[in-house]
Structure formats: structure tokens, C-alpha cells
Amino acid sequence: MSEPMMWLLVRGVWETLAMTFVSGFFGFVVGLPVGVLLYVTRPGQIIANAKLYRTVSAIVNIFRSIPFIILLVWMIPFTRVIVGTSIGLQAAIVPLTVGAAPFIARMVENALLEIPTGLIEASRAMGATPMQIVRKVLLPEALPGLVNAATITLITLVGYSAMGGAVGAGGLGQIGYQYGYIGYNATVMNTVLVLLVILVYLIQFAGDRIVRAVTRK
């Protein structure tokens, strides 16, 4: 493999990591409060509101049901408005965030559902407000589950970013598609696959370590 190709792969790794972690961050900025809202408005929860729950749940389900490659193409006009272009690293972050947010919201809701109801009832009996319950009971107790959700999300985004590479998003996906598939270069394709596997392994390893650390606390 030539030296220019090796440097191209290094840049591809950096672009893939940037797309994954930046979109993961913004996905959590949107998905975490939506997931908390889904939980607290469920029937029987601290601010139960069946109509609001059904509405938010329906919106989340709609966006979760759209395959990412279709979402990527569908959002091209919207992406152009936000970042001024529909190709490249910055453009990819927009649909990646939109694709991740509803996925995160559901995982946050599921993590909160694992919390024993006795803890919530005890907090309510002591006069805690809904916001205090969320901040001091729900989120701390669900922290291991939230870290696990973040790990799964980042791994999913690695795959999404690779798909985005096929339409000019950059990263390892674009290198694999352009030089491996279109250019009939099996060495490049196999190298891209190995690098993606390594990235996923490292993210999973780090996530597992963090989960163990916060669980001990």
C-alpha cells in the first residue's frame, strides 16, 4: 500500500471518529431530554400525560423507522440550509444526529424503566419535585444504563458514518467505497473493514470499563 493511501486512511479514521463522537454528543443533547420526557409522562409516572406521551412516542417511532441511508438523502436540502453544503464531514453530522437522537431517546427511556419504583415513591413521599427526582434519583440511578446506551449509540454511528461515506460524507466509508469498491482495490477495502472493527472494539472496551466504574460507585 502506498504512503499517500496510508495517510488517506489515517485521515479517514480521524473523520470517522469526528463524525461519530460529534453527532453522538448532539444526539444525546437532543435524545436525553426526550427520553426523560417519555419516561416521566408515561401512565403512572411522576408527571403522567398520556396525550403528550403518545405524541412524542409517535414522533420518535417515525424517525426510528426511517433507514439511515434514506434519511441521509431526504435531509440533503435541510443539511444545505444548516451548514451550507450537503457533502463532507460537517454535512454528515446533521443527519447522523437526527438519526441518533430518537434511538438514544428510546434507550434512555428503557434505562430509566429499570429503576425500582420504590426509589421514586420514596422521593415523592419526602416532598421532592419532579425535577429533583429526575436530577437526583433517576439520572444517577440510571447512569450505568445511560453509559451503555452511549456505547451502543457510538458503535451504531460508526456504521452510519460508513454508509454516509458512500454519498460523499468522508471518513473510512468513502475511502472503502471510492478506492475499494469503485477502484477494485481489495487491499484498501479489507484495511477499511479492519479499521472499522478496531474502532468498534475500542469503543465497546472503553464503554464496558466506564460501566463497571460507575456501577461500583
UniProtKB/Swiss-Prot annotation:
Xref: Pfam families: BPD_transp_1 (PF00528)
Any GO BP annotation: D-methionine transmembrane transport
Periplasmic topology ranges: 1-19, 79-80, 173-185
Subcellular location: Cell inner membrane
GO CC list: plasma membrane
UniProt entry tagged with the keyword Cell inner membrane: yes
Domain of life the protein comes from: Bacteria
Keywords: Amino-acid transport, Cell inner membrane, Cell membrane, Membrane, Transmembrane, Transmembrane helix, Transport
Ranges per topology, Cytoplasmic: 41-57, 102-151, 207-217
PROSITE patterns reported for this sequence: ABC_TM1
Residue span(s) of domain ABC transmembrane type-1: 13-204
InterPro entries tied to this protein: AA_ABC_Transporter_Permease (IPR051322), MetI-like (IPR000515), MetI-like_sf (IPR035906)
Membrane topology value: Multi-pass membrane protein
Transmembrane domains' residue ranges: 20-40, 58-78, 81-101, 152-172, 186-206
Function: Part of the binding-protein-dependent transport system for D-methionine and the toxic methionine analog alpha-methyl-methionine. Probably responsible for the translocation of the substrate across the membrane.
Protein family: Belongs to the binding-protein-dependent transport system permease family. CysTW subfamily.
Protein name according to UniProt: D-methionine transport system permease protein MetI
Gene name for this UniProt entry: metI
